[in-house]
Amino acid sequence: NEITDILREIERVSKLHNVFISGSAHEYTAPWNKQRAEELARKLAGALVHEECRITSGFGLGLGSAIINGALDIIYNEKYRHIDEHLCLRPFPQNIPDPDERAKRWKEYRESIIDETGISIFLFGNKYDAATESTVVADGCIQEFEIAKAKGNLIIPIGSTGYAAKVIS
């Protein structure tokens, strides 16, 4: 039993260098705009890689490219290592016509992504809802928060970015 506890603690501590960045941004509200949001995502990713973290991202709308660019800037300019040591991209599978099957697949996918990490950071978290023709809190980000919380991840919402991140904070 003590050995099992020790192994669990080792696993927990080793995952603290694996950081999941959750977020999407269809829209930006003051004081945020597209440029500032991308700069935040880029600088955050770069700082994490600089500190020897491995970033996992689902390539969220409006933020994914900035996360990649921030990580790659440091990998190429400072680390001279394989990209996989610092960056893991997990874009969500698309073109699943059955909404129930898509929801099930995405939940399983989120669980597998978050299971590999020890810290979850939440930025923005909004999406366009065609039914209401408005921008709403991204339910996927909320689901990722619930999964991360259940798995015991350290949760870091950047509430000032609004939407899901604000709800989580």
Predicted regions and their residues:
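Short, hydrophobic/glycine-enriched beta-strand segments
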Residues: L16-H26
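Acidic/glycine-enriched connector segments
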Residues: N1-D5, E27-S169
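Glycine-rich phosphate/diphosphate-binding loops that line cofactor/substrate pockets in enzymes
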Residues: E9-N18, L44-L48
